[in-house]
Amino acid sequence: MTLSSTTRTATPPPAPDYDEIVNVIQLYIDGFNQADIRKFRQGFHENAWWACTVPDGSLVQHPVEESLEEWVGDGFVKDWEHQILSVTQAGDVASVVLEMHSAAEGPATGWVDIHALLRIDGVWKDMNKTATHVSRAGWAATAGA
């Protein structure tokens, strides 16, 4: 059986607000590396959520606000390196695909995130972070190598 579709795939133009969108992602990275809860709160919407699949495929999910103390705590990695793999914007909505890993531990222990952002009252806010361990990330797993 052959399936046909009238759906077309369009290549999006460059994101007009690329710098502003990437700045939100930089706040996310800086929040970890500088253990600065204010940076997280500046970048994430107050009702943002995160979800991820860990190496065994299990799902973990929480409101971002409930995770901030752990993220800035002494036991959390503080040497994240990252690479933005894509930025797509359609008006007031944007997505960023991000590869990140510990400099000390290397790319094999990293994560691939998709961040969903909204422009609210002229300000970009990260509404949702969905991630997977690089061992489950397909082509994006080698981006940081």
Where do the protein language model's features map onto the residues?
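Short, low-complexity N-terminal intrinsically disordered segments enriched in polar/charged residues
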Residues: 1-46, 58, 62-65, 138, ...
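Short beta-strand edge/turn micro-motifs at domain boundaries
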Residues: 2-3, 110-141
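Surface-exposed, charged secondary-structure patches
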Residues: 20-23, 49-108
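Residue-level detection of beta-strand scaffold positions
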Residues: 27-28, 39, 99-101, 114
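Short, hydrophobic secondary-structure boundary micro-motifs
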Residues: 41-42, 51-53, 127
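Short beta-strand segments enriched in hydrophobic/aromatic residues
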Residues: 44, 100-102, 130-133
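Short secondary-structure capping/turn micro-motifs that flank functional sites
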Residues: 48-49, 135
